[in-house]
């Protein structure tokens, strides 16, 4: 079993993998708030992704590369040690955005990971990417141009490093409108649906990744210093393995597909001079299989500049590392998983930097507060991991866990 990182709802995992997640209650999401739409940024310029072996060409909806030089953009430089917070779409659109910037001004926080495309497929601002416009991804209360400019003015003024989070495969909006890009059922060729009744994009489709590339380039043109790709995987659902068909896999394993696609994305973005980073399950450091989702440590660790494992103690089952409740032992759990990461990475060529995601939310007992958050951070420091990012699905954090600036 494994828990969905956004809601905390427990999901099933491939039967071979039993390190999964303890069952728990769903976390509360923020209510929608925002501003009316205006034009967002200078046009994103892209080139088609280099299709991996056995792949097909990029879609017609990708943005054409132009020769016109974009206006100069001042990018916030990468901090020597990154300490960040996740900012969901609704927090970015509301007053919470300014509160989170204020937290960064007062504490050790120096980076914000902001949803540019969330796991519903919604884009934060009015997009110049034709496909985003066509499917209405940017039409649900997008951030206004004025607010977007004010946001980046504030981030630059306070030297806060902005990271654009772009969800790749979990996009029910696009999968529902581009059925040819959705995962299909083997039995009848209709879209495969997860347990919530939502379709997923097929990770074997190069067009799926091209859309993410187009949005990444646009985010960079808007002013984001870095792009972070999430859901770079197959669905974590036993039924998918039994029911779904992937014609473009051409005999490749799920892990090989993810390896190939990440490599193609990285090659495509090299000329854009922005770091490529990916989120992965924290369990990948300990589990030696791909867990049914296509994420196997040795096959993705050299496919990005930075890998961000989600090492939430609540996501480790009772008995893992000999702990009756890993969630009740945040220091020990993080200490053990980070040691596994170091062991799995030692000796590998071109391995990415590792920046762990830590848990600042409650999923099962005990309730998490400043002490539990700080225990995770200390475990990281004791293992030589000095950069980190905190995750709370509602973007509400225990500021007393953060050191003053």
Say what each PLM segment does:
Residues 75-88, 92, 153, 169-221:
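Active-site-adjacent "subsite" loops/lids of carbohydrate-active enzymes
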Residues 98-122, 221-226, 303-306, 380-387:
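Catalytic domains of carbohydrate-active enzymes, especially glycoside hydrolases
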Residues 33-36:
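Bacterial signal peptide processing site
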Residues 163-171, 228, 254-293, 349-362:
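Aromatic-lined carbohydrate-recognition surfaces of secreted/lumenal glycan-active proteins
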Residues 109-143, 236, 242, 402:
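Aromatic-lined carbohydrate-binding/catalytic grooves of carbohydrate-active enzymes
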Residues 304-318, 327-405:
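Substrate-binding cleft of secreted/luminal carbohydrate-active enzymes
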Residues 110-116, 144-193, 228-229:
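Glycine-rich, aromatic-flanked loop segments that form ligand/cofactor-binding clefts
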Residues 124-135, 171-194, 235-249, 295, ...:
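Aromatic- and acidic-residue-enriched segments that line the glycan-binding/catalytic groove
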